[in-house]
Regions:
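Outer-membrane beta-barrel translocator/receptor signature
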Residues: 205-213, 220-272, 295-298
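Short, acidic, small-residue-rich periplasmic hinge/interaction motif at the N-terminus
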Residues: 43-45, 79-83, 96-135, 155-157, ...
Length: 783
């Protein structure tokens, strides 16, 4: 009995050591460009009959670990839908077998029915799509690929939305970018696309919202990547616009160089018919207006990043933009007494303007990459100087009255300095902390000189000085089935402004605290089924561009004016998003706002025929938004992104509660007839909707794009037709304080755009390209 117990004890003690002798296979899986291949199936198979002994799937870094190894003769199989299957023999008797594998792209074309979840990683409030080896990226520009992702759509004004929420910020390798820049990027040159649905604490309060982050494929020493793109657009009644883009990225030694050169010439044409009724004056005025503006815009941005050491990087950016425009407006009007069928008088109005904008921008940045897990220290400093000269001439002629000529000269000047620093600490694979701070300083000067019939009649000035600071913090918890991000931002803003005629500067201080919480429940990892919940407290920006009470002439009977009494609005959003198998998306949002800024219409008490718009803190808003979308393939050659959405809520203003509701559909269809040859068809329909003091008619629009790749996918040709089926845009506006109301009809025009692009690149490796993060966008004024 003693011997039996002793033998059993020896066997128990020996078991862990026997387990330790079992073989383990591990390694990293990459592609021919050195990129990690995620979600690759690694199978251990018997040599005799190829039956599977065990298997694993590689992680997002391409790593795998497979145990235990069989004592029989076996081999490893590496299978991925985008690559050729690789086989590696396992040496018998090995305790530790390290096998790194480089997969080659699949020679056969992968059908669009590939499961998207293989390339998607979901985190709290955001998801990342890997485009390396992704069949969606083949023969597409990035602009065309984005609208095929779950919940995404592109509006007619070329902006993007995710689940009905506008994407307010776009970054390409940390650099703020515009939607137009995305059309010059082949999707296959992009490493990852990250879509952040909800706000985070590092966002300025006014800019909190959805974010799109693009990470380009890396280059090594001597590598380069560029696009030469040009386009020509014609309307159905003549020329519209032309231009070119030339982005270029290079790496030389420890230096990364990026340059974005662009030019555009745009002939903007708008045709309006208006009818304004003045009940208090017993008068109606009917007008036809033609507004034509010629724009010239030249922009160049040069960025240089120096990798001082593998962990320390310095960046410098210089940017310049010059824009000129010539706006012309011609209007003719007929004046009808109330109830009369014949006009009692007529009038004409013409305006001519000449505008020149100069913008200079300088940015410096520092990065300390503390470890390979993502811990880092960031510091950015940004300065922008904007100067403009605007000259206007207004000619007015009314029957029975002498003609009048008024000239205006405006000289706005804006300067902005912004500094930001943040620290990210990855404690372990489950917990990440982030903290940071910001400071800004802004100075705006606007001066208007007015002359009537050649004699100076007035000088108006407006000054604005603002500065503010913010601190914020985030914590991210990551588990296998659950992701949670919680953060808070505290921001202080000081506003000082002065208008000519005031006896002193006006000052206001604002303190705001905005928390945010995002949670993601991963219901089915392999099938891509998740549930996202979010709460975001936010507020509007300091309305510095709406404070000036100086008049800006719009047409013969309209002008706009600011409001020095404006304050930022405040509110919150509640969101829930259910994603089923990376294809179906059901989204719900409830938004609540207080002191909302609305542009209200009033009549001038000194001249009742003149109406003006003025922003006012006047409304309380509550709105429910619901959308259902499907993004996926219908056949091997037809992929769609369809969305049905609707809103219902209320606006409370001027003591009146007004119920509003609207809905619409969005249909995006991507057709691929052959490799490198395809077509995109988009259709949208939106019901009428209403806001305080205005109402919009129902709108529908149909557009189509035909594209072809030539010369081994280096030459890209595109023909796009916009507004093939679109009705006129009709707006009704009224005053809530008097008897003024008007109706404006904007005539829609078809347009056709031909685009040609040449792509050239030489990646030569896998070192990441870094760019200085500019904190501000360059924005020109054309009016």
């Amino acid at each position: 009995m003693v011997r039996s117990n002793l033998l059993a004890g020896c066997l128990l003690l020996a078991a862990p050591f026997a387990r330790a002798q079992e073989g383990v296979a591990s390694g990293t899986i990459t592609d021919s460009h050195g990129e990690a291949v995620a979600y690759c199936t690694v199978s251990l198979r018997r040599t005799a009959d190829s039956t599977v002994v065990t298997g694993v799937v590689s992680d997002t870094l391409g790593r795998y670990r497979l145990a235990p190894l069989s004592e029989e003769s076996c081999f490893l199989e590496f299978a991925h839908v985008a690559y050729e299957t690789a086989l590696r023999a396992v040496p018998p008797g090995r305790e530790a077998f390290v096998c790194d594998v480089v997969l080659q792209p699949a020679n056969n074309r992968i059908d669009e029915v590939t499961v998207l979840s293989r390339f998607v990683e979901r985190r709290a409030g955001r998801y990342t799509v890997s485009l390396v080896g992704n069949p969606l990226a083949r023969d597409r520009l990035l602009n065309d690929l984005l609208v095929l992702l779950p919940g995404m759509r592109q509006e007619q004004n070329r902006t993007f939305k995710i689940n009905g929420r506008e994407i307010r910020q776009i970054y390409i390798d940390d650099r703020p970018a515009t939607a137009d820049e995305l059309k010059a990027l082949p999707a296959e040159s992009v490493k990852t696309v990250e879509i952040q649905r909800f706000a985070s604490s590092d966002q300025e309060i006014a800019a909190r919202g959805a974010v799109l982050r693009i990470t380009l494929r890396p280059l090594a020493d001597g590598g380069y990547r560029g696009t030469a793109m040009s386009w020509l657009c014609m309307r159905d009644n003549g020329f519209s616009n032309t231009g070119f883009q030339f982005p270029l990225t290079m790496r030389y030694g420890r230096f990364n160089l990026y340059n974005q050169l662009s030019y555009s010439y745009f002939e903007e044409l708008h045709e309006y018919t208006r009818q304004a009724d003045y009940d208090d004056e017993a008068l109606a005025i009917r007008s036809t207006e033609t507004e034509r503006t010629d724009h010239h815009t030249f922009t160049d941005r040069l960025n240089l990043v120096w990798e001082v050491t593998p962990h320390h990087r310095l960046g410098l950016t210089g940017g310049f933009s010059y824009a000129s425009s010539v706006p012309d407006l011609v209007s003719s009007s007929l004046h009808y007494p109330s109830g009369a069928s014949l006009p009692a008088a007529g009038s004409s109005f013409a305006s001519h303007g000449e505008l020149d904008n100069h913008i200079w921008q300088a940015t410096a940045s520092y990065r300390w990459l503390r470890d390979e897990e993502g811990s880092q220290l960031k510091a950015d400093f940004d300065y922008v100087d904007f100067a403009s000269d605007k000259r206007y001439r207004y000619d007015e002629q009314t029957e029975g009255a002498p003609s009048a000529v008024t000239t205006e000269s405006q000289h706005p000047r804006n300067r902005l300095f912004l500094a930001e620093t943040s620290f990210t600490e990855v404690l372990n694979e489950h917990l990440t902390l982030q903290a940071g701070g910001e400071y800004y300083w802004r100075d705006i000067r606007r001066r208007t000189l007015t002359a009537e019939d050649g004699s100076p009649s007035g000088l108006s000035t407006f000054r604005y000085r603002g500065n503010g600071a913010a601190v914020y913090g985030d914590a991210e918890l990551s588990l296998d089935w659950f992701e949670l991000v919680g953060g808070v931002r505290m921001q202080w803003d000081r506003v000082d402004h002065f208008t000519g005629g005031d006896t002193r500067w006006r000052r206001r201080d604002y303190w705001r605290l905005c928390p945010n919480v995002n949670a993601t429940f991963i219901l089915e990892q392999e099938r891509g089924t998740t549930l996202d919940l979010a709460y975001t407290r936010d507020g509007s920006y300091i309305p510095y561009d709406m404070l000036s009470p100086l008049r800006i002439r719009e047409s013969e009977f309209r002008y706009t004016v600011g409001n020095p009494e404006l304050t930022p609005s405040r509110g919150y959003d509640l969101d829930a998003v259910l994603t089923l198998r990376e294809r179906w998306t059901l989204s719900y949002t409830y938004s609540r706002g207080e002191d909302m800024i609305e542009r209200m219409t009033f009549t001038d008490p000194d001249d009742p025929q003149q109406s003006y718009e003025q922003p006012v803190n006047c409304s309380t808003m509550g709105k429910h938004m619901l959308s259902l979308s499907y993004a996926g393939p219908l056949t091997k050659w037809w992929r769609v992104n369809w969305e049905l959405y609707g809103t219902r809520g209320f606006y409370r203003y001027a003591g009146i509660t007004h119920r509003v509701q609207s809905g619409g559909i969005y249909l995006s269809n991507s057709l691929q007839f052959a490799p490198g040859f395809g077509m995109t068809v988009q259709f949208s329909l939106e019901s009428p909707y209403e806001h305080p003091g205005r109402r919009h008619n129902a709108m529908h629009n149909l557009g189509a794009t035909l594209y072809k790749y030539l010369c081994k996918n280096r030459l890209y040709l595109n023909l796009e037709a916009r507004c093939l089926l679109q009705n006129d845009n009709v707006n009704w506006m009224w005053s809530v304080t008097d008897g003024y109301r008007s109706c404006q009809r904007h005539r829609s025009r078809r347009s056709f755009i031909f685009t040609a692009a040449y792509f050239f690149n030489n990646y030569k490796g896998k070192r990441d390209i870094q760019r200085t993060q500019t904190l501000q966008k360059i924005t020109n004024e054309y009016r």
